[in-house]
Regions:
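DNA-recognition alpha helix
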Residues: 14-33
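Active-site- or DNA-interface-adjacent structural scaffold in DNA-acting proteins
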Residues: 35-93
């Protein structure tokens, strides 16, 4: 297993390549590993990994990874996000692709845990299991719209954490009510952030609202304190085109929270975690589940 992890860090993924790596670095490896019988063959490596209990392996690996964090560092924002591993689809046996739900430490750039589901719709049941693995007290949990469920919000608050949940059309009339609210009341806080570079200018405007009595009466969300509207506008100086996108969120944080930073941290999962899984660990090419 140690040899496998070293190989993955060296961007090798085939079992015969792992065997060759072990043979090439045999003198170095035997100083730290017990290798009385030498480097195992690629067939042996394959069989060993078929027998591993990956839940236990994950737990041990995460405990080890936790020790790598600098002393005194803590999680502030934990982004929960799902990803379909396209390479896991087995059309011959009619097995769909595996969907993984990850917990990502935004500050530390570390995957804190994951749960496997058969499709994206099962994220709703996987997210509470994933939260149970973690100590989330005092953190901010960010989740996309699939995880915007009253039971999940309640669990986060009960575990003494806060939430920022993406709001789309999957929660009855809550999104429509939020849009109507904007026409009736003024935001209690506003902020703006501008990024320039590569011939583009991106402006992010955040408006924070306190829920109206109508929303309180018709939507039961434990801990709900704010509703957030985030509008991102991108101006391309070369093509002279402007694209604007508006997203809504509900949160247990108060109006003074740095919503732009927290939400951008969640978006960073695509670049930070998913890119590593695809390019370094080759998840979209893996077939073993």
């Amino acid at each position: 297993v140690s040899a496998f992890l070293l190989n993955r860090s060296s961007d090798l993924d085939l079992y015969d390549a792992i065997e060759e790596f072990g043979k090439y670095h045999h003198e170095t490896l035997k100083k730290r590993l017990s290798l009385q019988n030498g480097i195992p063959s690629h067939d042996t490596i394959n069989r060993v990994f078929q027998m591993i209990n990956f839940r236990q392996f994950e737990r041990i690996f995460l405990e080890w990874a936790e020790e790598l964090k600098p002393e005194g560092t803590t999680e502030t924002v934990i982004a929960i996000d799902g990803k379909t591993v396209r390479g896991s689809r087995d059309g011959y046996h009619d097995n769909p692709a595996i969907h993984l739900v990850h917990a990502w430490s935004v500050e530390n750039g570390l995957c804190l845990g994951q749960r496997k589901t058969r499709d994206k719709s099962n994220e709703i049941t996987a997210i509470p299991e994933l939260l149970d693995m973690l100590c989330i007290e005092g953190t901010i949990i960010t989740i996309d719209a699939m995880g915007t469920q009253t039971a999940i919000a309640e669990k986060i608050v009960d575990d003494k954490a806060d939430y920022i949940l993406a709001l789309k059309g999957n929660q009855g009339t809550l999104l429509q009510d939020a849009e109507l609210m904007e026409k009736e009341v003024k935001p209690v806080a506003e902020s703006e952030e501008v990024d320039k570079g590569h011939g583009r200018v991106e402006t992010r405007r955040c408006a924070v609202f306190e829920p109206t009595e109508w929303i309180w009466k018709n939507h039961q969300w434990k801990g709900l304190r704010t509703i957030v509207k985030l509008t991102a506008t991108r101006w391309n100086a070369i093509s002279k085109e402007e694209v604007s996108e508006t997203r809504w969120y509900i949160s247990s944080l108060d109006k003074d929270a740095d919503f732009i930073r927290h939400i951008r941290g969640h978006w960073g999962v695509e670049n930070s975690l998913h890119w590593v899984l695809d390019m370094t660990f080759g998840e979209d090419q893996q077939r073993r589940s």
